[in-house]
Design a protein with these regions (language model features):
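Conserved, well-structured interaction surfaces
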Residues: 13-89, 124-127, 142-151
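TPR/Sel1-like alpha-solenoid repeat signature
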Residues: 74, 162-165
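Short, contiguous alpha-helical
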Residues: 86, 165, 169
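Short coil/linker segments at helix-helix boundaries
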Residues: 87-132
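Extracytoplasmic ligand-binding clamshell segments of periplasmic binding protein
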Residues: 150-158
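Aromatic-residue-lined binding/catalytic grooves and analogous aromatic/hydrophobic interfacial grooves
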Residues: 159, 168-173
C-alpha cells in the first residue's frame, strides 16, 4: 500500500535556502556558507575577463558592441561588489564586539591582480571598495552606456546604472 513516492522523507533537494533560514550548516566546516562568496567572485572574475580583453584606454576608439560589453562588465562588477559589501560588512550592534573587522568589507580583485596577490588579499576597507571599485565602475558604465536603450528588461541600461548609483550613495551618505 505504501509506494515509495508516497513516503515522507528527508531533504530531497527542495528549498535548499532553508539552511539559511534555520541557520544550519553555515559554519566553516560546511560548503553551504561558501556558495555565495564563490559565486560572486566567479562573476567578478567573468567581468574582469571582459574588462581585460577590451582595451579601455580610450573609449572613443571602441565600437558600439565593445562599448556595450564593457559597460555591462563595469556595471555588473559594481553591482557584485555592492552586494558583497552589504552582505559581509560587519555592522555595529549591541550583541557582538568585533573591533578588528569594523569597517572592513571584502577583498578587491581587479583584472591586474596577480595570482600571488590574490592568495594574500585581505579584506579591504568598505570606503576603499566604494571609492576604488563601485563608484568608478558605475561612472565608466554610465559613460559607455549613455544614449543606449535596453531591448528588454534583462539587459543593463543607463537606468539600472543610475539605480545602482542611488543605492551606493544611500549607503555612503
Amino acid at each position: 500500500d505504501a509506494l515509495p513516492i508516497f513516503a515522507i522523507g528527508g531533504n530531497i533537494g527542495y528549498d535548499w535556502f532553508a539552511q539559511w533560514g534555520t541557520n544550519e550548516a553555515l559554519g566553516a566546516d560546511y560548503a553551504v556558507g561558501a556558495l555565495t562568496w564563490n559565486n560572486y567572485y566567479a562573476w567578478i572574475m567573468a567581468a574582469n575577463n571582459v574588462i581585460k580583453q577590451i582595451d579601455a584606454s580610450d573609449f572613443a576608439t571602441l565600437d558600439a558592441t565593445q562599448k556595450s560589453y564593457l559597460g555591462f562588465a563595469y556595471a555588473y562588477r559594481a553591482m557584485f561588489y555592492l552586494d558583497l559589501v552589504r552582505l559581509y560588512e560587519f555592522k555595529e550592534n549591541n550583541y557582538t564586539e568585533a573591533p578588528g573587522v569594523l569597517g572592513l568589507g571584502v577583498p578587491i580583485v581587479l583584472p591586474e591582480t596577480t595570482e600571488a596577490e590574490a592568495k594574500n588579499n585581505p579584506r579591504a576597507k568598505v570606503d576603499d571598495i566604494y571609492d576604488q571599485v563601485i563608484f568608478p565602475d558605475l561612472d565608466k558604465a554610465e559613460e559607455l552606456l549613455s544614449g543606449s536603450t535596453a531591448p528588454d528588461k534583462y539587459t543593463i541600461s543607463p537606468a539600472l546604472v543610475y539605480g545602482l548609483k542611488a543605492r551606493a550613495w544611500l549607503k555612503t551618505s
